[in-house]
Amino acid sequence: MNVFQLFIKSTYSPRDIAKTRFQGIGKAILYVFLLSVLFAIPTAYYVSTGTVKSMNGFKTVLNKDFPDFTISNGKLQTDEKKATESQANGFVIVFDPTDSYGTEQIEAKQNAIGILQNKFVLAIDGQAQEMSYSMMPSELQKKDVIAGLNQNKAMIVTVLSALIFLVTAAGKFIEVSFLALIGLIIKNSQKKHLSYHQLWKLSAYSITLSTVFFTIMRALEATVPSEFLLNWFVNFVILFLVLKEIPSKKVINKS
């Protein structure tokens, strides 16, 4: 069977999954990568579209609400003499040349961007990261920031998507490896003659059903109660049924 046929059958047929123990490990590894791509697509899509909307909103606020400014010698320089707050796509954007705001104040706003007197602060879900202007080019103007947003949008989305895939792939490989360890316990209780190597391949295909289900839920932005426990319960049941399809050890009676 090709990978696509295996994918379809792995969603409902423990008997076909059981046959994969004779495959090469390379095919199973490739399969886990493909599952990772599938599982990462909804998250990558929503994060990417959210990032683009935030960047567009930030650009609009810069154009309309904030005065011209220059970042030079590690400081924000402008004719404006007071701090300004605006909102765009769920983010609070603070422009403060007066040093009235600090990192703590930006962080308290949960989701916020701060263009402060001597640093740039980004807060997401109440966790702030800051970058001193001394790390930036010798001079940066408002028009340069807007141009940079336009030029780097595609690169930022690509990097974010790649990071999401890598994190997802790492999670899936850990999931398969741990499920294979559970498989060692199951195969001993069922008296099956299987190596960890074979159990890893079986586990790679056994996570298909849960991966497809949670991919659909993420695409629909639906919340699943006890997602972690449900995921592992489904994986455990599928692997248990797969191992039941494999013949047990033959017991030789000595007379």
UniProtKB/Swiss-Prot annotation:
Please tell me whether the keyword Transmembrane helix is annotated for this protein: yes
Q: Cross-referenced Pfam families, in alphabetical order? A: DUF1189
For this UniProt entry, what is the primary localization, expressed as one broad class?
A: membrane
* InterPro entries assigned to the protein according to its UniProt record, in alphabetical order: DUF1189 (IPR009574)
Segments forming a coiled coil? none
Question: Under the cellular component aspect of Gene Ontology, which terms does the record hold?
Answer: plasma membrane
Location in or out of the cell = Cell membrane
* Stretches that traverse the bilayer: 28-48, 154-174, 199-218, 223-243
| Keywords noted in UniProt | Cell membrane, Membrane, Transmembrane, Transmembrane helix
Q: Topology versus the membrane, per the UniProt entry?
A: Multi-pass membrane protein
Official protein name in the record: Uncharacterized protein YqgB
Instruction: Show the taxonomic lineage.
Output: Bacteria, Bacillati, Bacillota, Bacilli, Bacillales
